[in-house]
Amino acid sequence: MRREDKSTLKNGHIDTMIKPKGRRIGLIRLSAIGDVCHAVATVQALQRHAPEDDITWIIGRTEAALIADLPGITFVIFDKKQGLKGFREVLKAIPAPFDVLLHMQVSFRANLLAAVVPAKIKWGFPKNLSKELHGLAINRRVPMPETPHVLEGFQHFAYALGVPAFTPKWSIPIPQ
């Protein structure tokens, strides 16, 4: 039986997740260009809070083309057109298990991927926002409002890692 963390928010943070910096953080947000752009604000808040953390973003091919020039992030491309080979390619590109995986998507394909990506802690959405077997791919649920805007929901993933409340900021380099 899966044991879920019962942590609660204290001062805007998950009290059990405030850890030393220098973590290997994985993130899954494969698709939906608008949602990927919202996730950028959360990733950049994580970078400002803990620049020593190593962030790897597992992302779709089209979405990666939009944000591939973001500094300080390793991108692993998931090509859904490759089927099972796409899953194997992602796993080959991850050199070691993540300390933390932020599973920021509830599609069936993303849930399958999160289930096989190695990580000690896998944060996902609360039950009311989960679907397509999301709960089977995670071992902790991020507390958040009942019906958050996508951007607000993503911010709560950063709070779970000890980032204090922040105003979203985007800095997306545009190639010449």
Ranges and model annotations:
Residues 1-176:
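Catalytic machinery of carbohydrate-active enzymes
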